[in-house]
């Protein structure tokens, strides 16, 4: 974006001496050196990264500041609303409530971004470490865990690399906040940073290397909720003074839905995720969900199309597995992925301008602190000092007056004792076993309904019995 200097000053000051003493190559040059195994119908022999033309400089002044009426949800503390022209705001919200996919090539998207004034953005990455990753690669990854680290890259490694190749060109300083969620230390309540003291990754090469180091240290768990990672992204945007960001979530499945959830109703995890997406639409933040593994993805497509009451359509779902399994050249598949991920960004960025969301703080966004990286044994370093706050941003325009942050604390779940492991659901590792399958194995009623095969013996599930 046009506020690169202040953003760069902040990010460089936040980046520790480690990165200052060892500059890393760009993500594009790094990714171009990677080689990949067979995935679907094509082999992963990457061509040189695509060349992005430098877009014209955006010369328009930043939009004027005015107050917005905050989204009112039980978990958020909002300041009093102010009158600022509600009719015009409602008109703009109707205009951007559903953004269509209007482009057929990556060049068209790049040109549209330039016309909208978006020379660059800031990427945030979130990665799903829930238990379902152990069986959602049954068809697409030869029945192995999607997080299996071996001689050939797993789907998460492939997605990280291709995102680094195709989307990193739109990140202005190559410093990427990266977080994990859904493991035994975070469940559906928190996120952990890929680096200690919440240091950002220096390009996607460090994202990939830290991913490989972290996976053996953690314990997959659940349930699945995207609310914590979206909350973390909102904290970053708020502390940047309202700079435009794109949150890329790489996940293997949709949000946990309990068997007790009635048709037309949302589970607690679904409701919190919807609330977070709606709240994020009050900020200059776009959300791209990249789906890896077998799915299912019907609820994510529903999130993409039909979440109500948003200031603008800020959510895009991309089925990575489906695109990468197509019988076409690898370069064409990469272009299709980048196009799918960026398709709505030009209109979303334009919406943040017209809704006057850029360049100011809201003052009512909950401040979230990430946990430190997990240690061997499946838990974060609980006895380590409290992680430091995110580094201070230097906004390019005076921040919106605030009344102080409402800090929402998330309790750290205690490590599960080995004596009680047998009584807990083997998927989420938090709920008691209260559903049995025909094979005799058991899970909880939240995890069981979404399974097609038993996670223990892999037998097809034909009978589900709720235990009382």
UniProtKB/Swiss-Prot annotation:
The keyword GTP-binding does not apply. GO terms for cellular component: nucleus; plasma membrane. One of its GO terms (biological process) is auxin metabolic process. Residues 12-45, 66-84 have a biased composition (Low complexity). GO terms for molecular function: ubiquitin protein ligase activity; ubiquitin-protein transferase activity; zinc ion binding. Keywords: Abscisic acid signaling pathway, Cell membrane, Lipoprotein, Membrane, Metal-binding, Myristate, Nucleus, Stress response, Transferase, Ubl conjugation pathway, Zinc, Zinc-finger. Residues 46-65 have a biased composition (Pro residues). Residues 1-89, 369-416 are annotated as: Disordered. Pfam families: Copine (PF07002), zf-C3HC4_3 (PF13920). Ubiquitously expressed. It catalyses: S-ubiquitinyl-[E2 ubiquitin-conjugating enzyme]-L-cysteine + [acceptor protein]-L-lysine = [E2 ubiquitin-conjugating enzyme]-L-cysteine + N(6)-ubiquitinyl-[acceptor protein]-L-lysine. Residues 122-342 form the VWFA domain. It is a lipid-anchor. Interacts with the heterodimer UBC35/UEV1B, UBC35 alone, PIN1, but not with UCB2, UCB9, UEV1B or UEV1C alone. Interacts with ERF053. A C-terminal fragment containing the RING domain interacts with UBC35 while the full-length protein does not. This is E3 ubiquitin-protein ligase RGLG2. The gene is RGLG2.
């Amino acid at each position: 974006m046009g506020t690169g200097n202040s953003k760069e000053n902040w990010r460089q000051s936040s980046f520790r001496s480690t990165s200052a003493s060892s500059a890393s190559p760009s993500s594009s040059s790094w990714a171009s050196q990677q080689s990949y195994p067979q995935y679907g119908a094509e082999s992963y022999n990457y061509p040189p990264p695509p060349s992005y033309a430098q877009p014209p400089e955006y010369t328009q002044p930043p939009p004027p500041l005015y107050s917005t009426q905050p989204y009112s949800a039980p978990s958020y503390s909002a300041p009093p609303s102010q009158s600022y022209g509600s009719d015009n705001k409602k008109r703009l919200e109707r205009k951007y409530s559903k953004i269509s996919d209007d482009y057929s090539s990556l060049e068209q998207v790049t040109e549209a971004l330039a016309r909208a004034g978006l020379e660059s953005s800031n990427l945030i990455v979130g990665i799903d470490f829930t238990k379902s990753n152990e069986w959602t690669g049954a068809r697409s990854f030869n029945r192995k865990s999607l997080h299996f680290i071996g001689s050939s890259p797993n789907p998460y490694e492939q997605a990280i690399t291709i995102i680094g190749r195709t989307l990193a060109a739109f990140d202005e300083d190559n410093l990427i906040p990266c977080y994990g969620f859904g493991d035994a230390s975070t469940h559906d309540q928190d996120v952990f940073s890929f680096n200690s003291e919440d240091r950002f990754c220096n390009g996607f090469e460090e994202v990939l290397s830290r991913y490989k180091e972290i996976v053996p240290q953690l314990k997959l768990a659940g349930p699945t909720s995207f609310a914590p990672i979206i909350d973390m992204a909102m904290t970053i945007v708020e502390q940047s003074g309202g700079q435009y960001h794109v949150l890329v979530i790489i996940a293997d499945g949709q949000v946990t839905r309990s068997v007790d959830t009635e048709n037309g109703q949302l589970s607690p995890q679904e409701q919190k995720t919807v609330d977070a997406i709606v709240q994020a639409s009050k900020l200059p933040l776009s959300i791209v969900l990249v789906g890896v593994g077998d799915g299912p993805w019907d609820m994510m497509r529903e999130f993409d199309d039909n979440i109500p009451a948003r200031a603008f359509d800020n959510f895009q779902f991309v089925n990575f597995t489906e695109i990468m399994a197509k019988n076409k050249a690898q370069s064409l598949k990469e272009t299709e992925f980048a196009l799918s991920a960026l398709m709505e960004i030009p209109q979303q960025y334009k919406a943040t301008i017209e809704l006057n969301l850029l360049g100011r703080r809201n003052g009512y966004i909950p401040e979230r602190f990430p946990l430190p990286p997990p240690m061997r044994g499946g838990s974060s370093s609980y006895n380590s000092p409290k992680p430091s706050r995110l580094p201070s941003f230097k906004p390019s325009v005076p921040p919106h007056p605030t009344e102080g942050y409402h800090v929402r604390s998330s309790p750290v779940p205690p490590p599960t004792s080995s004596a009680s492991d047998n009584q807990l659901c083997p998927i989420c590792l938090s709920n008691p076993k209260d559903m049995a399958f025909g094979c005799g194995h058991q899970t909880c009623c939240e995890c069981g309904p979404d399974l097609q095969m038993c996670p223990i013996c892999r037998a097809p599930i034909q009978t589900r019995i709720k235990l009382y």
